[in-house]
């Protein structure tokens, strides 16, 4: 029983440590990184530069997977692009 509790505790800790987010990466002014069909290689490179696991061009902007919590992503409700 103690072993089972320890296993569950470890799994919960791993989930907290490896938690990541997905979303559109943004430029310093708050706008999404623009892309065109066929530029998924560029988006993937940009996402990995920001410590994400991968990314692709979800036209018209780069979508990233596995971003760390400190990386800002586009938020529709707090959009600062062009303001």
Curated annotation (Swiss-Prot):
GO molecular function, one term: toxin activity
Family under the similarity heading: Belongs to the long (4 C-C) scorpion toxin superfamily. Sodium channel inhibitor family. Beta subfamily.
Compartments reported by the entry: Secreted
Major site of localization recorded for this protein: secreted
Function: Inhibits the sodium (Nav) currents in an apparent irreversible manner. Produces small depolarization and induces repetitive firing in squid axons. Is specific for arthropods (crickets, triatomides, crabs and squids), but is non-toxic to mice. Shows antibacterial activity against both Gram-positive and Gram-negative bacteria.
DNA-binding is among the record's keywords: no
Cellular compartments per GO CC: extracellular region
Domain remarks in the Swiss-Prot or TrEMBL record: Has the structural arrangement of an alpha-helix connected to antiparallel beta-sheets by disulfide bonds (CS-alpha/beta).
Keywords: Amidation, Antibiotic, Antimicrobial, Disulfide bond, Ion channel impairing toxin, Neurotoxin, Secreted, Signal, Toxin, Voltage-gated sodium channel impairing toxin
One of the protein's GO biological processes: defense response to bacterium
Expression across tissues: Expressed by the venom gland.
Cysteine amide: residues bearing it: 81
Keyword Disulfide bond in record: yes
SMART domains attached to this UniProt entry: Knot1
Organism this protein belongs to: Tityus discrepans
Domain annotation LCN-type CS-alpha/beta: ranges: 21-82
Disulfide linkage: 31-81, 35-57, 43-62, 47-64
Protein name: Ardiscretin
Pfam families assigned to the protein according to its UniProt record, in alphabetical order: Toxin_3
Domain of life: Eukaryota
Secretion signal, residue range per the UniProt entry: 1-20
């Amino acid at each position: 029983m103690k072993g089972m509790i320890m296993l569950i505790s470890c799994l919960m800790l791993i989930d907290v440590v490896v938690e990541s987010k997905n979303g559109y990466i943004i430029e310093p002014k708050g706008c999404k990184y623009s892309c065109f069909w066929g530029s998924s290689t560029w988006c993937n490179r940009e996402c990995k530069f920001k410590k994400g696991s991968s990314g692709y061009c979800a036209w018209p902007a780069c979508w990233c997977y596995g971003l760390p919590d400190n990386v800002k992503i586009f938020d529709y409700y707090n959009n600062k692009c062009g303001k």
